């Protein structure tokens, strides 16, 4: 499908950058649409911590191309012993296969998106109040987001936004940017191709700096991490 991007006039944007394909493409879209971009990554003790290395590498690459992104990695790894999930260190084995399989529930991290959302909202509100200008939170949500993750559902997002607006002053200057709402991973990747051309950056140089795997494999010969091509996130990326 052809994505219809709602192009923004707002100056400021805050994005949660996981280091995966979706959020990395969203970062490129934000760079194109906004004057200033703040990107946040979270270390919550995830096994696939290589995604944070990829996120930093992408930021560094974009800086060399003249794109100044304010970037912060936020340490939440003190939670690792308190969270029950296959995705965190000390958790069960990460299951393989498609998201639709029941065993994928093991990859749910309790309240993860709410934790990330609260911090992202706080930063966006701080930017909005400091500048006195409209600030958007960019979300990479898309039609392929899965019901197995309750915090990817529209009902959850609506309730989360309601809580944010009820719990803070001066929230009228904070909005949302969701360019991929009606698309899937294939559409996101196609938009990435367009954005790389528009921003005059190399597609391969960008996406080699991403990780979409819950079970990345370390190659001791090259000292590089590679996708396992078996975990659900990796299977979806290959299918795209």
Descriptions of predicted regions:
Residues 118, 122, 211-239:
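Local cysteine-cluster metal-coordination motifs and their immediate loop/turn environment
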